[in-house]
Design a protein with these regions (language model features):
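A short glycine-rich, Lys/Arg-flanked "PGG" loop and its adjoining helix->strand segment in the class I
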Residues: 152-192
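Hydrophobic beta-strand segment of the Class I
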Residues: 137-138
């Protein structure tokens, strides 16, 4: 099938909006911090003057990168107090890296003397570093995103709600190809014995990711807007959240074949009803949760509006969607709160 969306389109809202509204992502990735510390304690270190290289794959605005990368830097420095360290934050070229640089100068920064951060504006499903240059890699809640949409899926906005058939097969195929591409490039870039610590959206064997309730609400809102003439049918057909939450079998299946040893693989979860418990208690869940939902859906959804729409028209459609969704979340917050399933992998590059 031909692609309907080119690779390399940023899906996160910039200007710090995503960074300020990504509490669930950090909660989901926290379980991997111990694995990151363990990896930093054992990965091979380079001979001087070559710096150790830590790769951060999918940094977005950087808010959720400071704490885990501090774990990585501290772990490496515990072994060599003056080790020079490069930290490469990677994301799509359209990503807004400005908030990341601001955070690096703030109190939450991992920076210390001899640590050198920089950014790489390229897709993580392609080459990023030279051969055998990377020592430790980290990625949090990124690798379930698809490089592009291989097919339109009318009347559905989320892969876990798509029925078995050609569309679901196309999404699964794109996900599998992306995952293999990521592993192939990292296997090339890592030194022997280098490690990756990765977290991502996952599905249980029964096919559920824990976010179905929210996305069913979204589907209902989109259908209402088409019925009311606020959204065109062709636009609605293209709107989709471009992710595939792999099962554990899908996550681990190609790993050893592509040059890695699996040191740890865990399936955990994070509950947004707990993450936003105070909001539920005081009746403000919709007010507090909607910015998170908007941060992850605004660009993926509304880039598909027809090109003839004016700026004001596009803004009106977008605001109408989130106003309607706010009402649905407020009416049934427990159904909207996601119970995300999360995979954690610790992988070691086998000797060539």
């Amino acid at each position: 099938m031909s692609e309907i969306a080119p690779a390399g389109q940023s899906v996160m809202l910039g200007g710090g909006f995503y960074s300020h509204n990504s509490r669930p992502q950090r909660a989901a990735a926290t379980a991997a911090d111990a694995h990151l510390a363990a990896a930093a304690a054992v990965v091979p270190l380079p001979d001087r003057p070559t710096p150790a290289l830590v790769g951060d794959f999918g940094c977005a605005g950087g808010a959720n990168e400071m704490a885990p990368l501090a774990v990585a830097v501290d772990g490496l420095r515990a072994r060599d107090a003056t080790l020079p360290i490069e930290v490469a934050h990677t994301d799509l070229p359209q990503n807004d890296f400005g908030p990341l640089f601001a955070l690096l100068q703030g109190p939450s920064s991992y920076l210390t003397e001899g640590v050198y951060p920089y950014v790489v504006g390229r897709t993580l499903y392609g080459p990023l570093f030279p051969d055998r240059r990377l020592h430790l890699g980290w990625s949090a809640i990124t690798l379930h995103w698809l490089s592009s949409m291989p097919v339109t899926v009318p009347n559905r906005v989320y892969a876990n709600l798509v029925e078995p058939g050609p569309a679901r097969d196309a999404l699964a195929g794109r996900s599998a190809a992306d995952w293999r591409a990521f592993l192939t490039e990292r296997a090339r870039e890592l030194v022997d014995g280098g490690e990756l610590v990765l977290t991502g959206g996952a599905s249980f064997p029964d096919g559920r990711s824990g976010a179905e309730g929210l996305f069913m609400m979204i589907q209902h809102v989109i259908a209402e807007m088409v019925d009311d003439g606020e959204l065109r049918a062709g636009e609605a057909d293209r709107i989709f959240y471009p992710t595939w939450n792999r099962t554990m079998a899908e996550w681990t299946g190609p790993v050893e074949e592509l040059g890695f040893e699996v040191l740890a693989h865990e399936l955990t979860g994070t509950d947004d009803a707990e993450n936003y418990g105070e909001s539920l208690a005081r009746g403000t869940f919709a007010d507090d949760y909607l910015p998170f939902v908007r941060a992850i859906t605004d660009r993926p959804f509304f880039r598909w509006l027809d090109a003839d729409r004016t700026i004001d028209d596009r803004a009106g459609v977008t605001e109408a969607f989130y106003e309607r969704l706010h009402g649905r979340i407020a009416a049934d917050p427990w159904a909207a709160a996601c119970h995300w399933h999360v995979v954690t992998l610790r992988l070691r590059r086998r000797p060539r």
